[in-house]
């Protein structure tokens, strides 16, 4: 028995791939800003967390580009998760100094307009990645809905 998994319709799949590329670019720009600012500008927890998050970003982007069946779910989690984590880490005042690299609370080492641009680019592209993924997931569900409909058994009325 062969199980065939339906792919998202062309437009949803195409938008998901473009959103994945944009998110990868946003993540890369943010990484370049961390290199520009110097590795000592952020607490070690932020640097390690960013590297771990990078693994999730790569996985979600590769899944979207290769049209894996669970790519939309991964992209929703990684896109929204990244937006929330980076908003906390960079845009809010410092609550826990070892876990934040706040741009608005001191010491904000080497923070320039490019730092703000890179953080907002990553947050924005993360949100776009997640929203486009929600739409791609919905289109997959609509396309497979007739396949999931249960057939009535003999003698059972609906």
Each predicted region: which residue ranges?
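Short, highly charged, low-complexity non-transmembrane loops/tails of multi-pass membrane proteins
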Residues: 141-158
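Alpha-helical transmembrane segments
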Residues: 14-28
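Interfacial non-cytosolic loop connecting adjacent transmembrane helices
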Residues: 37-45, 88-114
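Membrane-water interface at the C-terminal end of transmembrane alpha helices
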Residues: 10-15, 113-144
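Loop-to-transmembrane helix junctions at the membrane interface
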Residues: 62-91
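Alpha-helical transmembrane segments in multipass membrane proteins, preferentially the mid-helix core
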Residues: 55-66, 128-132
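Transmembrane alpha-helix entry/boundary detector in multi-pass membrane proteins
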Residues: 30-56
């Amino acid at each position: 028995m062969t199980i065939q998994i339906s792919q998202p319709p062309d437009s949803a799949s195409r938008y998901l791939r473009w959103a994945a590329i944009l998110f990868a670019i946003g993540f890369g720009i943010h990484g370049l800003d961390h290199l520009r600012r110097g590795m000592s500008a952020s607490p070690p927890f932020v640097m390690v967390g960013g590297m771990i998050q990078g693994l999730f970003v790569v996985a979600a982007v590769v899944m979207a580009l290769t049209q894996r069946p669970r790519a939309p779910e991964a992209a929703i989690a990684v896109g929204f998760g990244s937006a929330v984590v980076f908003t906390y880490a960079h845009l809010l005042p410092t609550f826990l100094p070892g876990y934040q690299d706040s741009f608005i609370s001191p010491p904000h080492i080497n923070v320039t307009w490019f730092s703000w641009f890179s953080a907002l680019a990553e947050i924005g592209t993360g949100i776009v990645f997640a929203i486009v993924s929600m739409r791609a997931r919905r289109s997959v569900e609509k396309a497979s809905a007739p396949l999931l409909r249960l057939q009535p058994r003999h003698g059972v009325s609906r």
